[in-house]
Amino acid sequence: MQTKIVLFNQNDVEKVWPLAVEMIQLACDTNGGFDAKDVLAACKKGTFQLWLIVGDNDKVYASVVTEVRNYPKIKVCDIKITTGVMYKRWFHHIDDIAAWAKEQGCKKMEVFAR
């Protein structure tokens, strides 16, 4: 089974949000820093980016939320949330996010984990 990763434009996030919200809220429940409503608002604003990893059966296996941040001397891509099921089928797509971040001018990746 193949999987693909899709980055959603801030204007399209609300359309696909129902596919991601449950996984994202579960991740937020363990994080405590924000909830799914906060993530949705930040994605719609363009502050956060929403990625979905889907299988050729249209099943959503994972949701990833990133944020590109500018520090005084470096631009970084933070992976704020990575949540899903059957990670061996999709975890390799994190490399796709890293490649995208490099295209955005990011020199470094930062990952938040519990």
Predicted regions and their residues:
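Charged interaction scaffolds used for protein-protein
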Residues: 5, 45, 51-53, 96-102
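Polar/charged alpha-helical tracts
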Residues: 11, 18, 37, 41-44, ...
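Residue-level detector of functional hotspots within protein domains
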Residues: 34-39, 63-65, 95-97
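Acyl-donor binding region in acyl/amide transferases
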Residues: 72-114
